[in-house]
Amino acid sequence: MSDKRRYFGTDGVRGKVGQYPITPDFVLKLGWAAGRVLAKQGTKKVIIGKDTRISGYMLESALEAGLAAAGLKATFTGPMPTPAVAYLTQTFRAEAGIVISASHNPYYDNGIKFFSSEGTKLPDDIELAIEAELDKEIECVESAELGKATRLNDAAGRYIEFCKSTFPSELSLAKLKIVVDCANGATYHIAPNVFTELGADVIAMGVTPNGTNINHEVGATDVRALQQRVVEEQADLGLAFDGDGDRIIMVDHLGNKVDGDQIAYIIARDALRRGELKGGVVGTLMTNLGMENGLKQLGIPFVRAAVGDRYVMEKLLEKGWKIGAENSGHVILLDKVTTGDAIVAALQVLASVVGSELSLNELSKGMTLYPQVLENVRFAGQGNPLEAEAVKKAVEEVEADLGSKGRVLLRKSGTEPLIRVMVEGEDGELVQNSALKIAQAVKDNC
C-alpha cells in the first residue's frame, strides 16, 4: 500500500463545497469506505458531529448513507465542537468519531475529519486503508445488516459537564466579567453555558449562526470585534473560539490579543508553580521565539514540531509530555483531553487568573513576543514557487539582513491553497518589509 495520501490532508479531507472532493457523491463513498475499514474493528458504531455551516446538513446525510451501506450505525450530535466529538467517541465506546467542519475556513468550505475510538486523530495506516477502499465499487451489506441512524439529544449537556470537570473544584469564576465570542460556530450553545455555570458574568457574541456567518468577522481568526467589546464592556478578558471549537485566542482587559503561544506559556508556568508540570512544551515551526526564550528562562524544555496539531500531538506522544500548542490557538493538554480543546484550554488559563489573583495582562507579560509577520499568498497548485530562484534569492537576502536576531519560514498550507510566508525578528519594521519582499517574490512566481 502506498503511503502517499490522495485525499487526507493534515486535518482530514477538506475543500470547497460542491467541488471535488467535497461533493455528496464523494462523501457518500467516503462514508462507505470508512465504514468498510472500521467495521472490521468491533462495535460498528460511529459518532457524527458538525459545525454550523449550511452544507453540514447535506454532507451528514451523504456520510450516513455511506456508513449505513457498510453496516455501521451512526449517532448524530448536531452542531458540536470538534473536541466534544472526540470526547463522546470515547465515552460511547464508538468505533470512530467523525466531524463535518472546515474549522476556521469560510462557510463555503467544508471537510470531514475522523477520530479513533481513543478520541485521537486516525493513525496513518487507517487513513491509507480508507483511501484504498475508495478505489473499489460500492457494495451494500445484506439488508438485515444495514446501519441505522439515531440522534444523541443530550450531547451538549454531557460535554458541558466534562468541560466544567477540568476546572479546579475549589475555584470559581464569580468575580470575572468575560466576553465570549463563539464565531457563530459549534460552541455557540456550549461555551457561554460553561463559563456562566462556573460563576462568570458572561457577555456572549457570535452566537447567532445562520449557516453562512461562521468565522465571518468574529472568532479566533478575527478578534477585532472582541477586542472592541472587551474594552467597551470593561470586561476582565475575552475569549474567541474558532468555528469548530478547537482554537482559542484570548483578549486582555486592555484589548490586547493573547495568542496560542502565550496561552500555552501561562498554562505551563502555572503547572510548574503547582509542581504538576510533566516534561516540557511542544510548539511548531511557527512558534514565536519569545515563547521559546521565556520557557528557557523558567527551565522548561521546549521543542518544535512541524506545523499542524497532528504533528504537535505526535511529538507530545514521542516525548511523553502533556502541553503542546500552535500560535494560531490550537492548545493540546494531554493530561485532560485527547485533542486540541479550546474551552478546556481557556478554563486552565482562567484557573491561573483566579488562583494567582493576577490579570490576564499580567500573566501574559512573562514572555516577550518578537514581532512576527505572516503573509498568505494564493497558490493555484501549479509548480512549486518555493523552488524558484527569485524566491530563494529574496529569502537569502532577508536572512542576511536579520542575522541571528530573526528567522524566515516558507511553507505550503496543509488546509488551504496558500503559500505562507513568516518572518520574525527583533526589529518590527525590518520584519514587516522583509515579509512583503518575500511574499512579492512568491506572487511573481506563482
Curated annotation (Swiss-Prot):
PTM per Swiss-Prot/TrEMBL: Activated by phosphorylation.
Annotated positions binding Mg(2+): S103, D242, D244, D246
Listed CDD domains: GlmM
InterPro entries for the chain: A-D-PHexomutase_a/b/a-I, A-D-PHexomutase_a/b/a-I/II/III, A-D-PHexomutase_a/b/a-II, A-D-PHexomutase_a/b/a-III, A-D-PHexomutase_C, A-D-PHexomutase_C_sf, A-D-PHexomutase_CS, Alpha-D-phosphohexomutase_SF
GO BP: carbohydrate metabolic process; peptidoglycan biosynthetic process; UDP-N-acetylglucosamine biosynthetic process
Modified residues (Phosphoserine): S103
Cofactor or coenzyme needed: Mg(2+)
Reported function: Catalyzes the conversion of glucosamine-6-phosphate to glucosamine-1-phosphate.
Matching HAMAP family: GlmM_B (MF_01554_B)
The protein's name in its UniProt record: Phosphoglucosamine mutase
Gene from which the chain derives: glmM
